Amino acid sequence: MKFNLILLFTLFFSSQFILAQHTLGNPNLIEHLNEFSKTSSITGREKQAASYIQDLFQKGELKKDRLGNLIMVLGSGHPKRLITVPLDEPGYVISHIQQDGFIKLNPLGFGYIGNLYHQFIQGHEVIINTETESLIGVSTVRSAHFDGVRANPESMKSPFSWHEIYLDVGATSASELATRNIQLLDPVTLNKKPVTINNSYVAAPSIKSKAAAIALAVVAKSIKEIEFKGTVVFAWTTLELLNGKGIEAVINNYGPFNEIHRFNRFLESKKIGKETLLANNLISKKGSNLVKTKPVIDFRNPASTINFNSENIYEIGLPSLYENSPVELVAVSDVENMIDYWLKVLDINVKETEVPQLKHETSKTSYDSFNEEHNLVSKLIGKYGVSYDEGSVRKLILNELPNWAKPKIDRVGNIVLTFGKGKEHIAFVAHMDETGYFVNSISDDGRLILKMRGRMFPWIWEAQPALVHTDKNPIQGVFEPRADYRNSLTRLSSEPLKVFAGFNSKNEALAAGIKIGVTTVTMPKEMIRISENRAAARGFDDRVGSAALLKSLKDLNPNELSQRVTFIWSVAEEAGLIGSTFAAKNLTDISTVYPIDTYVSSDDPYSDESFANSPLGDGAVIRVLESINFLSRKNLKKIQTIANKNEIKVQYGMTAGGTDGQAFLGYGIPSIPLSWPGRYSHSPVEVMDYRDLNSLTSLISAIIKNPSNN
């Protein structure tokens, strides 16, 4: 992920804000908070964040020293004051590259507060900043389907630690990683997904210090053409979470100072949006409401040449919620208040503070192959459809059907498409729904209390962005971390998952269209390519199966078939095979059903290869044995014969879980489940291989065109 910023410095009134008159956040300020929060800047590798700040100024206005600090000096004489904020953030470096292509990490520096800090990276996208580019990968998680057969279930474990982290970037060997320029000690962070709530709050990793850096840039830009008494040094410093030498170098090289005003990310208060700021050492400034607060941890200053307990060093902080989590949240009004405070510290009266407009371009790694496959599956992934709420998925599938198709929607919402002629009647079924949550109740303070649909690891959803799906537009929010996330001793929380979406009361939530028992809640999702052959997303189960059915229709002429074929895109499979149960009752003349669903593979860095060992990239999978079905030798040989005849690469094996085929077994209809191998089931980072999708599509097409083998 690269940020190419084109900044427009000729500003209209709409791109300015008057601090005293604002209730909602300034749009330009919010945009900068969002964009800057996406930058990766682990301590000692702050280049991306520094480049963003530099691009806010004209060339030469900021000086970059040998440690990477950014400095701007304005004015002359006394008093001499320093205002400083950190550029760095907590993060990881690559500590080991395995021969099988998986990557191990080690945390860098300090600032990892709370027992769940590393758990919040499990099962989510990451950014690896190589020497030449930013690459995307996933932090792996054990497949949820296997938890019932594990001797030590995930839900019974202590919190996830950094020692357990494995990264998957779609590589199969260490040499493949080398060709992509991934090396030891490359920095790694979460792939950050900032959330704006009600145009009043912004949530993102390390948003307090990120917001402070933007606020300081606004102050510096606003006064650089104004005459004032004394000297002001603005500094965006490096290395704070490693050794503190960034700020130390600025003080030694640009001091001595009469006053030093330092942003302290470790000052905490939950009183957001109350026009208060936090202070370690109080300084009386008219109009500023400072609350004395002690930091939760101290800075590390090894072998320091500076007395950081000096009386002329004043520390300021921002109130926030969910501190030190991926959804650390600040009020935009508090960021504006910090800008106002720093101007008062400098005794400078600025009526209007300029926030530059921002235009940005995000360049992504391009790939040469499987673009058609990616585009189709990506469109399906882009639609949300928790069980019983599949409407948008259904609409897309209907739009993707060929012109000759005459689909029907049955009473429960399944898409049923029958074509071809003949006595023999076979069916294929893939489900449209995905796992997720629905609103089970609403608390008096407006929090949405959730209940799960499907089987997942609920801790993976804690402290992540949320989308609340109403009848109108989705509402952004955050999945709150559990109340004791700092001190929790268990991986699984005993509390129900909750969402904060900016509501202050139950009535506000109801007025916004939240319906108890109906409204569904998910994470935002987007399909990402992690290598030439592989992609990751939440919801491949079963959007890949849905895509395989659609692809098999592309070049099909139904008039050439000598058997009847029914395709079913079913609803609510994850909630108990609701759609397929209804379909099976009405399609009892079917001779064989082929459920098209995920094969949960042990092809991951955790699992025993003696179970479900069907590697990604080795072709479609015949699910011979699963939790609810054991395929006959006759039917296995039948599918293998079709595959061999058509030179289709297939695998076969056993795995956990079941499919829509179970509903048809009750009517005496044999079920032959066909799948693609997938990693990290029912997580936000399920991984698939495009080659397996194509193999599965070819197998479906061959079965349709080979009635004598059915």
Go through the PLM ranges and name each one:
Residues 14-15:
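N-terminal signal peptide c-region/cleavage motif recognized by signal peptidases
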Residues 19-710:
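N-terminal hydrophobic/helix-forming segments and targeting peptides
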